[in-house]
A protein has these predicted regions:
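PAPS/PAP-binding and catalytic site of the sulfotransferase fold
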Residues: 30-43, 147-148, 169-173, 247-272
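A long, hydrophobic alpha-helical segment
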Residues: 126-131, 135-151, 208-212
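PAPS-dependent sulfotransferases, especially Golgi type II membrane carbohydrate sulfotransferases
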Residues: 1-21, 198-247, 253-331
């Protein structure tokens, strides 16, 4: 169709979801803990994994979707998502999944919604309640300008989870993600073609180096470059966007969760539900950190020295220094 500017996609005259939380971070960084906490704040909906938001963000970052198109679909999707949650549609009722309301004891609220009448009365109820909807994403911050732009004032809090990068590298390697992503049929990450090779979308900025690396070096590169993107994007945020961005450090969250919960409540203009202690007990928060969270540089290098060149040892040292300097601003 010609004259695309004349017919550019928009969703500017309809609005359902007005209180969005983006919950973002690397795998094993503690997102599910914070997602469960969000569900026990007043007006908080239960968190669910919906890959549509991150896939839209990825396609926009890769230049495959315009800002206008991506923004319009983001708004459509979150409004539709909230409406469906409000009538018990598309809720994950698998009892063993972390992203199921059964996991945190909120199943009765969503099961009751299944039998409720749908339609305009639901919209009126949503507008009256003004619910908070958390959107769970994976390693998008650093590539996520479109989420700020697309959601605009609807985005009330962008939470970025951080954790000891040596632990994340160790976990990524032990779980063999390098040989699962874009290779196994049950993997659903966005993939890209690079020189007739299929690579994960998040390595496109260092694809050549990634292709030459061994499996363990690929794990190092993945976390190293992700964290560099996080540091860079945060420091370049405008003050209004920085104000709604919350850095949560896993090691601090575990021992002092109320440090973050208080900030979340203030940012979202809400408070803890009367049964909030129930979820803290279920999540075993606060608690002491286990030994793996203290994975030191020396132990890490000793464990993996046979798989690391001097170059990668240098990258690890740089990453650790930069990480400690960055998180010192938030704890």
């Amino acid at each position: 169709m010609k004259d695309s500017e004349k017919y550019r996609p928009v969703r500017n005259t309809q609005e359902i979801a007005k209180n969005i939380i983006v919950l973002d971070g690397f795998s094993s960084s503690g997102k599910s803990l914070v997602g469960s906490i969000c569900g026990y704040l007043e007006r908080g909906e239960y968190w669910q994994i919906n890959y549509t938001y991150e896939r839209l963000s990825i396609l926009n970052y890769l230049g495959e979707m315009s800002d206008d198109s991506t923004s319009a679909i983001l708004k459509l999707e979150v409004d539709n998502h909230l409406y469906n949650l409000s009538i018990g549609r598309d809720v994950n009722f698998r009892k063993t999944d972390l992203s199921s309301p059964f996991y945190d004891g909120r199943e009765s609220a969503y099961l009751e919604r299944i039998s409720e009448k749908d339609g305009d009365s639901v919209i009126r109820a949503i507008i009256k309640k003004n619910p908070i909807i958390p959107l769970h994403m994976h390693y998008i911050f650093g590539h996520s300008d479109i989420l700020f732009k697309g959601f605009g004032d609807k985005l009330k809090l962008y939470i970025v989870m951080l954790r000891n990068p040596l632990y994340l590298i160790d976990t990524w390697h032990r779980q063999n993600w390098v040989n699962l992503i874009c290779k196994k049929e049950r993997d659903f990450h966005m993939c890209c073609n690079y020189n007739n090779h299929v690579i994960p979308w998040f390595v496109v900025d260092y694809a050549n180096e990634y292709q030459k690396a061994n499996d363990f070096e690929k794990a190092v590169l993945t976390v190293y470059n992700y964290y560099n993107k996080v540091f860079e994007m945060y420091d370049k945020l405008s003050e209004p966007r920085k104000t709604k961005t919350m850095i949560i450090v896993y090691e601090k969250l575990i021992v002092d969760p109320n440090f973050y919960v208080d900030t979340m409540c203030a940012s979202l203009k809400t408070k803890r539900r009367n049964d909030f202690d129930k979820i803290m007990k279920r999540l075993n928060l606060p608690r002491d950190l286990d030994d793996s969270s203290f994975l030191s540089h020396d132990i890490f290098i000793k464990t993996y020295k046979d798989q690391l060149s001097e170059k990668y040892i240098g990258l690890l040292q740089e990453l650790e220094v930069n990480y400690r300097a960055f998180i010192s601003r938030f704890i």
